[in-house]
Regions:
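Conserved small-residue
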Residues: 26, 36, 56, 124, ...
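Active-site glycine-rich loop that binds ribose-phosphate moieties when present
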Residues: 107, 144-158, 169-176
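Non-catalytic peripheral regions of patatin-like phospholipases
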Residues: 2, 15-19, 68-105, 127-141, ...
Length: 227
């Protein structure tokens, strides 16, 4: 059977409807996670656990909290003016935006909900600048966990939370396959919205990356993450 035939059979005739879902990073491309979740649900799959990082943590967390419709409405209504309204410019040594407006939106959507109180198993990851390791949030404030996981270095202000300083989870683990909760007989679905493999990029793109990784990379290395 061809690969396309296998994929068709997978989606149309599932032997098990239980799914463990992993949503990776990818910036704005991660909005595709919304469509992936809808496609699974339309085909009768039941997502029993979801793990995400960066934009995947945002989409996965809001889905787990039952706020997918609200998230989709926000995305569909986004225009240039709406995007600019969320950009709270606050230039510092380590960031361009404070991220407080995003946190306000999260608060409006999920309030003080705890991860352990969600109806499905959810976790997300962030990168700890103090220990230099990946941190996985399985308990505690959902909105703070999501905010920490999407803190793109140099764009959003790092999050100080429980005596740690966090930035985007994708720094350590772009697609956290090793963090998702599994049950016997379930399907594992992973959605990778990150940039394509650079080996297949056009030659001029490779030249741009080489230049950026030289000078810009040294600039990033010189930045100290502190207030």
């Amino acid at each position: 059977m061809s690969i396309f035939g296998r994929i068709k059979r997978l989606f149309l005739s599932p032997k098990s409807h239980e799914v463990a879902l992993v949503l990776g990073g990818g910036g704005a491309r991660g909005i595709a996670h919304i469509g992936a979740i809808e496609a699974l649900e339309e085909r009768g799959y039941v997502i029993h656990s979801v793990t995400g990082t960066s934009i995947g943590a945002l989409v996965g967390g809001l889905w787990a909290a039952g706020k997918m419709k609200e998230l989709k409405d926000i995305v569909l209504k986004l225009n240039k003016k709406e995007v600019l309204s969320l950009m709270d410019i606050s230039i510092g040594l380590n960031h361009l935006m404070s991220g407080e407006k995003l946190l306000t939106v999260f608060d409006q959507l999920v309030g003080d909900r705890k991860i352990e109180d969600l109806p499905v198993n959810f976790c997300c990851s962030a990168s700890d600048l103090v220990s230099g390791k990946e941190t996985v949030f399985r308990r505690g404030s959902l909105k703070m966990a999501m905010r920490a996981s999407i803190s793109i270095p140099c764009f959003f202000k790092p999050v100080r939370f429980h005596r740690h300083i966090y930035v985007d989870g994708g720094v350590h683990n772009t697609l956290p396959l090793n963090r998702v909760a599994r049950i016997k007989g379930d399907w594992l679905f992973a959605v990778n919205a990150s940039a394509p493999d650079r080996r297949f990029a056009p030659a001029f793109v490779s030249k741009i990356r080489k230049h950026r990784e030289g000078k810009f990379g040294k600039f990033l290395d010189s930045i100290s993450f502190h207030n």
